Regions:
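N-terminal helix-turn-helix DNA-binding module of bacterial transcription factors
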Residues: 1-66
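Amphipathic helical "hinge" segments at domain boundaries
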Residues: 55-118
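Hinge/beta->alpha junction and helix N-cap segments in small-molecule ligand-binding domains
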Residues: 75-83, 104-115, 136, 170-179, ...
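Hydrophobic alpha-helical
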Residues: 129-130, 134-148, 215, 230-306
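Flexible loop/hinge segments that line or gate small-molecule binding clefts
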Residues: 138-176, 304-312
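A conserved helix-loop-strand patch within extracytoplasmic ligand-binding domains
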Residues: 177-197
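Hinge/cleft segment of the Venus flytrap/periplasmic-binding protein
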Residues: 219, 323-362
């Protein structure tokens, strides 16, 4: 197939050559500046129309020395997946510098709506774009809307607040992710009946709430012999998740499945069985003597150093994966497109859901 040349490949020099005028004259016509004879204006505009020429926004901004600043509001605390996103942002430094962009990360307690709203409010008038891992709460929603009203471009990252006036969401379809986790747990449990545990960070995080919703949909309709227990909220903290799950396992010896919706994975694994993490010599406070990791189907999220080890050791059965590098790059590209008034390439920025097991670890 023959390659199609796009009109944007043309430069001002090409238009000037075709119209028989100088570069300065073309620039004056493009920006409606005075001092150009009417017949010259007509000639330049005719050349532009014939070639469907569009000025290159990025080149024009670079020529004017236009710099932009973006802020990423991220969860504080040891969340391995969020740390991966931050690391990928750091790897983009050369790409960012070439476009006169700077990105800073702002760590905050995203489980505390007041703290998160305050972090967003502090950015008003201070940056061109904000990407935020958001809690779906009225105070956070109002803070997002205030940023938008102030002219800041806002993208929700990983966890959405669709009722706000944010400009775009970058992340997976979390209901579909939860349904996928439900299908995996149900099918891997097999013919057994029993109970299923869910550990989440917070149901106030929309990504966690949507995953739970999707998971419960599948459990209720496709696996009626499995009973889903009330959700434990571990705030993505290892110690809290371990304590909550440990108590639940002792109270319900017939648990056959576990869905870990967010982080806190090390605590969840410790509650299941210490010997799965023998290389770290962690203390099992819940069930080391029962070998529970061999009985409970364990599905979680994201491929990190820890989940990779758990998958290889057979403690974790599957991870629902989203590409943190893609999310970091997509969030920056979307913010830049919004700031420039350019179209968002939605298919390019769509974040896929992948199922990762021991046999297809990347």
């Amino acid at each position: 197939m023959a390659e199609t040349l796009t009109p944007t490949a043309l430069t001002l020099k090409d238009i000037a050559r075709e119209a028989g005028v100088s570069l300065a004259t073309v620039d004056r016509v493009l920006h409606n500046r005075p001092g150009v004879r009417p017949d010259t204006v007509r000639r330049v505009k005719a050349a532009i129309e014939r070639n469907a020429f569009q000025p290159h926004v990025a080149a024009a901004e670079l020529a004017r020395g236009r710099a932009r600043r973006f802020a990423f509001v991220m969860p504080s605390g040891p969340n391995p997946f969020m740390q991966q996103i931050e690391a990928y942002l750091g790897e983009m430094s050369a790409w960012l510098a070439a476009r006169r962009l700077s990105v800073e990360t702002v760590a905050t307690d995203v489980f505390d709506p007041s703290a998160l709203a305050a972090s967003l409010e502090a950015l008003s008038g201070d940056c061109d774009g904000v990407a935020v891992v958001a809690l779906d709460h009225p105070g956070v929603r109002a803070a997002i809307n205030d940023l938008v009203d102030a002219g800041t471009k806002v993208v929700t990252l990983v966890s959405d607040v669709p009722s706000s006036r944010r400009h775009h969401y970058v992340g997976i379809d979390n209901i579909a992710a939860g349904r996928t986790a439900g299908a995996l747990v149900g099918r891997l449990v097999g013919q057994r009946s029993g109970k299923v545990a869910i550990v989440a960070g917070s149901q106030g995080l929309r990504d966690h709430a949507e995953r739970i919703f999707g998971f419960n949909q599948v459990m209720a309709t496709e696996f009626p012999d499995l009973s889903v227990l009330p959700v434990l909220e571990g705030r993505d903290e290892d110690d809290r998740s371990e304590q909550l799950l440990g108590r639940l396992l002792r109270s319900h010896p017939d648990i056959v499945g576990l869905y870990n919706v967010g982080a806190g994975t090390q605590g969840v694994a410790k509650a299941l069985n210490d010997k799965a993490l023998n290389d770290k010599a962690l203390n099992d406070k819940a069930l080391s003597e029962a070998g529970r990791d061999k009985q409970v189907v364990f599905v979680g999220h994201d491929v990190t150093a820890l989940t990779r080890r758990l998958l290889l050791q057979g403690v974790m059965d599957a991870a629902i994966s989203q590409n943190p590098g893609h999310e970091a790059r997509a969030a920056v590209r979307v913010l830049l497109a919004l700031a420039r008034g350019e179209p968002i390439l939605r298919e390019q920025e769509k974040i896929r859901i992948d199922i990762v097991m021991r046999d297809n670890l990347p």
